Structure formats: structure tokens, C-alpha cells
Amino acid sequence: MEQVVIVDAIRTPMGRSKGGAFRNVRAEDLSAHLMRSLLARNPALEATAIDDIYWGCVQQTLEQGFNIARNAALLAEIPHSVPAVTVNRLCGSSMQALHDAARMIMTGDAQTCLIGGVEHMGHVPMSHGVDFHPGLSRNVAKAAGMMGLTAEMLSRMHGISREMQDAFAARSHARAWAATQSGAFKNEIIPTGGHDADGVLKQFSYDEVIRPETTVEALSTLRPAFDPVSGTVTAGTSSALSDGAAAMLVMSESRARELGLQPRARIRSMAVVGCDPSIMGYGPVPASKLALKKAGLAASDIDLFEMNEAFAAQILPCIKDLGLMEQIDEKINLNGGAIALGHPLGCSGARISTTLLNLMERKDAQFGLATMCIGLGQGIATVFERVQS
């Protein structure tokens, strides 16, 4: 079976969904920009040699509809002979895109794939056109379709206080801002055209979603966003609404070596699981455990974790049940997470994996694990092993 390697991993800056940098930029353009950038950064790869493109996107309608993967590839002037498919596993879409490509390579059906994902939540809101089947209420609580209420449920089940949530959210912003200031994101962010507050065209090379002024004290004044009577989850402890894309160049190790391209990491294992929709945010726990089992590793073997921060109330129970509460500041989301950077649904799986790979290189780490919860009760995880140059 072929070894699957990540040769390159990049992303756009994360733009605010409400009047942000990409308010006049379409999702297809964000995607095409990264496809072109991957090829420009790796000139040894001919575009005609790409076997397939897998692109995650959740709200596949309006500008994100009609197979956005193919539309973006055509915009990027990738040869017409290269196919492309859009993948949807809700929040896990672009990580699923990675898994799909990896399996193609493992089985010998492909040698080279572009993967990634995009979501423009400013142009296509998360709830746009959603119409749940009435019969679902026979099997699933209606509140299970309301992500904030599932986070409230988890916080109550696991004893996660409002104070713990506020502290974690403040940490996310502080770490993301520190990473920005230190240049830690420089190798992953591709400068991307947008418009400033005055409508002037500008190249953005930083995440505009981060709020460096965030404090626990300020967060403590916010009202509950989903359960106004007894809730603890606020807008400040939830992932921000943002627009963005992320992408990776995935190859068989043999093809990468043949082209003289240095692999950055191998995919050691992959896992996806289902869980109770009412606690959808718990999915990373069984997904991570399954991925670790497949890799022949324990949580203690993992040097760095990237766990998508859908809500502080959601990620903290996952950290707790993976036995990592005492290691948060050494191992988990060292450059902040979705609370500070936002969670463009179809983009996030590739985004957290990209950030993880860069952190693994900076920290000289051997193993990293990226994982995320998925709406309606699923979890997805990937274990990466760094390839020494």
C-alpha cells in the first residue's frame, strides 16, 4: 500500500463574514487562488499530473453550488482533463476530502491530488435554505440541530463552568494574536486580495477575525446566546463567523520523491465516527481514540493536537475525556483556534491540519493529531507523522 504524504499546505487569511475583507470576493475565487498557489509553490508538479481535486464545502448553493470544486479548478486554469469533486461532511468536509484523496492514493488509483475546502459564510449563511425533515423529531431532539444548544448540553454533562469557557476563549484570541505577531502563520497564509473598510483593494496576509483586546472580564459580561435563561455559552465563547479557504498538495511518497518534492508529513491514520446528535460536539473523543488505535499510538504519544473550537463548552469536555486537561498549554491549539480565527465550515478541516503541520515543524514534533466535531453527531480525526528532511 502506498504511503500518503502532505507536500504542501496553505490557507487564505480568515476574513470576517460581516463586512469583512472578502465581502466582495467569491468562494470560487478564494478556492482558485489557493489551487494556483499550490502549483506555483511546487513548480516540479505539472498541473496535468493531478489525478483529482477534492474540495470541501457545506452550503453547496448559490456561488458555492454546482460543484464548486470544478468551478474553482476551471477558474484556476487547471487543465480540463483534471477532474474535481465537492465533498460534504458538514464541519469535517475538507478533512473528509483529505481522507478521500488519501484512500485513492493508498489503493493506487491516484498519485497526486489537490484537496481543500472553502466556506463564504458572509455570502451563504450556515442556515440558508436548511429544511429538516419533520420526521427526524421521532428519532432526534429538535435541539440537536441547534449547535449552540448541543454545546450547552455538553457543558452541563461535563461540569464546564462559564468561567472555564471564558478563560479558554480569551486564550484562543491571545494565542492567535501572539502567533500573528511572531510570524508563526507566515508560512501557511497566502496573501489574498480583498477590500479594506473603505472599499479599497488590498492584499490581506493576516486573520482579521482575531480580537487581541479580548479579556476574560469582557467575555464575562456577554449574555448567553442560545439559552437565555440558564445558558453559559455566549457569542464570545463560540467560533467566529468567517470566510476562508485552505488547501493541501497530497501525493504518494514515491511520486513526491520522484519529482524531488520534500514531503512534510505522512498520514499515519484516519478515522470518522458517529455519536448522539444531541452531543455532536463530543465526536472528537471517539474519533481520536479510533485514529490512535489504528495508528498503534496512545494520546500520550501525540506531541501536538489541533482540535476545532466550535465552542469552548464543546472542546473542553473533549480535552477532559482524552486526558489532556493538564497539557492544554503544551499540546493543544498552541496558535489559538476557531474561537479566534473563525470556523468557515468547509474550510476548517484543512485549515487546522495546515496549522498543525506548521506547528509540528516549528516544535520539531513527530506526531500530531487533528480532530473536529461535526453537526448532527459525527467526529473526524487524522494522525500525522512528520517526515524529517
From Swiss-Prot:
Gene3D superfamilies: 3.40.47.10. The keyword Cytoplasm applies. CDD domains: thiolase. GO terms for cellular component: cytoplasm. Signal peptide: none annotated. Pathway: Lipid metabolism; fatty acid beta-oxidation. It is found in: Cytoplasm. Its EC number is 2.3.1.16. The active site is at C91, H343, C373. It catalyses: an acyl-CoA + acetyl-CoA = a 3-oxoacyl-CoA + CoA. GO terms for molecular function: acetyl-CoA C-acyltransferase activity. It holds the Pfam family Thiolase_C. InterPro entries: FadA, Thiolase, Thiolase-like, Thiolase-like_sf_Thiolase, Thiolase_acyl_enz_int_AS, Thiolase_AS, Thiolase_C, Thiolase_CS. Keywords: Acyltransferase, Cytoplasm, Fatty acid metabolism, Lipid degradation, Lipid metabolism, Transferase. One of its GO terms (biological process) is phenylacetate catabolic process. NCBIfam families: AcCoA-C-Actrans, fadA, PRK08947.1. Heterotetramer of two alpha chains (FadB) and two beta chains (FadA). Catalyzes the final step of fatty acid oxidation in which acetyl-CoA is released and the CoA ester of a fatty acid two carbons shorter is formed. Belongs to the thiolase-like superfamily. Thiolase family. This is 3-ketoacyl-CoA thiolase. It comes from Citrobacter koseri (strain ATCC BAA-895 / CDC 4225-83 / SGSC4696). The gene is fadA.
